[in-house]
From Swiss-Prot:
Interacts with PTST3 and SS4. Interacts with MFP1; the interaction is essential for the initiation of starch granules biosynthesis in leaf chloroplasts, for the correct location of the process in the stromal spaces between the thylakoid membranes, and for the association of this protein with the thylakoid membranes. Interacts with PII1/MRC; the interaction is essential for the initiation of starch granules biosynthesis in leaf chloroplasts. Residues 165-201, 256-292, 314-347, 367-388 are annotated as: Disordered. The keyword Membrane applies. It is a peripheral membrane protein. Residues 1-71 form a transit peptide. GO terms for cellular component: chloroplast; chloroplast thylakoid membrane. Residues 173-183, 320-339 have a biased composition (Basic and acidic residues). Involved in starch granule initiation in leaf chloroplasts. Binds and delivers suitable maltooligosaccharide substrates to starch synthase 4 (SS4). Residues 389-454 form a coiled coil. Keywords: Chloroplast, Coiled coil, Membrane, Plastid, Starch biosynthesis, Thylakoid, Transit peptide. CDD domains: E_set_AMPKbeta_like_N. It is found in: Plastid, Chloroplast; Plastid, Chloroplast thylakoid membrane. This is Protein PTST homolog 2, chloroplastic.
């Protein structure tokens, strides 16, 4: 199998792609950038000697550097061009975070493995350690080989970015090298296949080759008879792109695809795809294959519910005989019992992941509820846009103007109130003065009323009409006296104590009463009235 990025057929192999022995490219066709007599052959010999099987490893078509090439369990990786020195700031930060994780883990004295980080949900640390490389990720390549599975061809390749696997392939030198000539893939495949087959038939390398084949069959990476790839180069479409069946992704990407699709249907399609492509149906069901598969998964830290057979598309395979297809269909019927359990295991994994997310959300909500109100920032405040801020600023300015106008009105009202209070005070003072004057008069009048005496004046003689006048009112009025039943005329007056002169007018004539004292004043005789 081979994975080539989308583009013309002259495109190069991804550095994370797995290349079978019969699909190893002849590097001399890549142009003058690489030395075909030294570097290309060195890469091929290195892969053969280490692997000793049909899988030669991971190959990157780039100039090799002395400080940037590492070997681990038959896998050759090419490091990126960026500097990964121990004194870099990112390395120190990464080591600090790993140390904090070890302190909070169940085994503080043991360096965490990839399985421990994934179980704790620290996918960010896994990604950073893989990018950093070096001793931090030492031994992880063993787990990655067992975790790599194949995805259903119904999923489009655009869902997973191919550019992530080729970070440094956009340089002008690489583009110039890759555009040089057309690759004769069929001739290179045949020549490389014959060279590898001659060394994989006997000795320890032959035993390792057979064990590797059985492991690949148990993991869904099946190899056809005579060491040929399962449509590795036949999977290349006419336009140069690689079908989705030849893509290799990690277990975490498979989990994301399983979350968006039906777990039961997806597990069934993957299982049937793996069984239908196998050229040797008996190997996948043999006890040796199951034992090797169980040992590999336990060594990588996966259980049966976390690791399933890879999915291989049968649409890109050519040259498969009809009798092999019939045998594969029989093997597919034997695996129906495991399909149901696999779908249930996928559902359990998805439910566990969902429960962990809900638990983290619940803990964040509880933390926000327990924190002081002034430190809690609501989502509404965080989502306030610049337009809303401008509107709030305008509203604030409008409210400030209203407050200023209200304050001015309040000040004017207070001034008017002060003037009114002054007027009221003046009016109160005047009223109090008038009241005091009136009270003084009332007191004087009351005292005068207390001094008044009632005086009764009588005219005993007969007459028809009798009037009374005197000095008690300055001789200004003539008061008519009342006639009683017995013919006596009388009149009551209230006078202050003293002496008064009075005189009667009887039927129009001025007369004095001979029974009262008589005084002469100015030649006139008047009666004297004394009030004691």
């Amino acid at each position: 199998m081979v994975s080539i990025n989308s583009g013309p057929i002259s495109s190069f192999v991804s550095r994370y792609s797995m290349i079978d022995s019969d699909t190893l490219l002849h590097l001399s066709s890549f142009g003058s950038t690489f030395n075909p007599n030294y570097k290309a052959k060195a890469c091929i010999r290195f892969a053969r000697k280490v692997c000793g099987s049909t899988v030669l490893g991971f190959l990157e078509v780039k100039p090799r550097k002395k400080s940037c090439c590492s070997r681990c369990n038959g896998v050759s990786r090419m490091c990126n061009k960026r500097n990964l020195g121990w004194d870099s700031e990112g390395s120190k930060d990464l080591e600090t975070e790993i140390l904090e994780f070890m302190k909070n883990s169940e085994k503080p004295g043991m360096f965490p493995s990839k399985k421990d980080l994934i179980r704790s949900g620290r996918f960010d640390l896994v990604e950073r350690i893989v990018n950093q490389g070096g001793w931090l990720s030492m031994g992880w390549d063993l787990d990655e080989q067992e975790e790599k599975v194949r995805v259903n061809e119904n999923v489009t390749p655009q869902d997973l970015h191919i550019e992530k696997q080729l970070p440094n392939c956009n340089s002008p030198e690489m583009d110039k090298t890759l555009n040089h000539g057309d690759l004769d893939l069929s001739s290179n495949l045949s020549s490389s296949t014959e060279q590898v087959e001659s060394r994989n038939d006997s000795g320890i390398e032959g035993i390792l080759t057979r064990l590797e084949k059985e492991r690949n069959l148990s993991l869904g990476i099946s190899v056809r008879e005579n060491g040929k790839s399962n449509g590795a180069m036949h999977d290349i479409s006419p336009n140069g792109s690689v079908p989705w069946s030849s893509r290799i992704v990690t277990a975490s990407e498979i989990q994301e695809v399983d979350g968006s699709r039906g777990s039961g249907e997806y597990a069934q399609s993957r299982y049937q795809g793996a069984k239908s492509v196998s050229g040797k149906p008996g190997l996948s069901d043999s006890p040796t294959s199951e034992t090797w598969r169980t040992w590999s998964m336990r060594r990588a830290g996966f259980t049966d519910e976390d690791f399933e057979a890879a999915e291989i598309s049968s649409s890109g395979l050519t040259g498969v005989k009809k009798d092999d297809t019939k045998k594969d269909s029989g093997d597919s019927m034997n695996g129906k019992d495991r399909i149901a359990s696999s779908s249930e295991d996928v559902n359990k994994t998805h439910i566990k992941h969902r429960l962990q997310q809900l638990q983290s959300e619940l803990s964040s909500v509880l933390h926000s509820l327990r924190s002081p109100p002034d430190k809690v920032v609501t989502s509404k405040d965080s989502e306030t846009t610049a337009g809303n801020l401008e509107n709030l600023s305008d509203d604030w300015e409008y409210k400030e103007n209203e407050i200023i106008h209200a304050q001015n009105k309040l000040r004017s009202t207070r001034a008017k109130l002060a003037v009114l209070e002054g007027k009221m005070a003046m009016a109160i003072i005047d009223a109090q003065r008038i009241v005091r004057e009136k009270q003084r008069r009332i007191d004087h009048a009351s005292r005068a009323l207390r001094l008044l005496r009632t005086a009764s004046i009588v005219w005993p003689n007969s007459a028809s009409e009798v009037l009374l006048t005197g000095s008690f009112d300055g001789w200004s009025t003539q008061r008519k006296m009342k006639k009683a039943e017995n013919g006596v005329f009388s009149l009551s007056l209230k006078l202050y104590p003293g002496k008064y002169e009075i005189k009667f007018i009887v039927d129009g004539q001025w007369k004095v009463d001979p029974l009262r004292p008589i005084v002469t004043s100015g030649g006139y005789e008047n009666n004297l009235l004394i009030i004691s």
